[in-house]
Curated annotation (Swiss-Prot):
UniProt key word Lyase: yes
GO terms under cellular component: 3-isopropylmalate dehydratase complex
Signal peptide: none
Listed InterPro entries: 3-IsopropMal_deHydase_ssu, Aconitase/3IPM_dehydase_swvl, AconitaseA/IPMdHydase_ssu_swvl, IPMI_Swivel, LeuD
SUPFAM superfamilies in alphabetical order: LeuD/IlvD-like (SSF52016)
One biological process term in Gene Ontology: L-leucine biosynthetic process
Gene source species: Staphylococcus aureus (strain JH9)
Coiled coil (residue ranges): none
Protein name (Swiss-Prot/TrEMBL): 3-isopropylmalate dehydratase small subunit
Keyword terms: Amino-acid biosynthesis, Branched-chain amino acid biosynthesis, Leucine biosynthesis, Lyase
Alphabetized GO MF terms: 3-isopropylmalate dehydratase activity
Length: 190
């Protein structure tokens, strides 16, 4: 009973954004947090870097460059998603089109928010990220915990609980529903 789209293998276009300490306010500025739904935040992702003061695209911002248009894998620096615990940051990146984020490290809360929103956060050393950033596309194999370029494969760690959720397309509600009969049995015993 999948509630989110399962992630097993994924091949996609990359965009490098090698800044360290990108916080949730840089990912989605608080001025844009006026919605209660998870959608509609994509146009505001990286708002202050993505657009010039006149509202036009900033040509120096990597995701705006023609060679990176349509990228679904973000390769970034250390301590990604630090700052406040706003889940809107994960919503904005997902709505923008990212499915995988590869960083040197993540804020714990941001990491959890990614997995809860069917995005795979991957931690890799800087040398691996720099290698992968040379290619237009890379491939992720979640069951085997690898990220591959055409000439090299890197292993990554992920907690088995998060891996199981993502591979099987399970959100928290779907996991709870797996125990529905036990819950009903307990309720009847009260």
């Amino acid at each position: 009973m999948a509630a989110i789209k399962p992630i097993t293998t994924y091949k996609g276009k990359i965009v490098p954004l090698f800044n360290d300490n990108i916080d949730t306010d840089q990912i989605i500025p608080k001025v844009h947090l006026k919605r209660i739904s998870k959608s509609g935040f994509g146009p505001f992702a990286f708002d202050e870097w993505r657009y010039l003061p006149d509202g036009s695209d900033n040509p120096d911002f990597n995701p705006n460059k023609p060679q990176y248009k349509g990228a679904s894998i973000l390769i970034t620096g250390d301590n990604f998603g630090c700052g406040s615990s706003r889940e809107h940051a994960a919503w904005a990146l997902k709505d923008y089109g990212f499915h995988i984020i590869i960083a040197g490290s993540f804020s714990d809360i941001f990491y959890m928010n990614c997995t809860k929103n069917a995005m795979l956060p991957i931690v890799l050393e800087k040398s691996a990220r720099e290698h992968l950033a040379q290619y237009e596309e890379i491939e992720i194999d979640l069951p085997n915990q690898t990220v591959s370029s055409p000439d090299k494969r890197f292993h990554f760690e992920i907690d088995e609980t998060w891996k199981n959720k993502l591979v099987n397309g399970l959100d928290d509600i779907a996991i709870t529903l797996q125990y529905e009969s036990l819950i009903e049995k307990y309720e009847k015993s009260l």
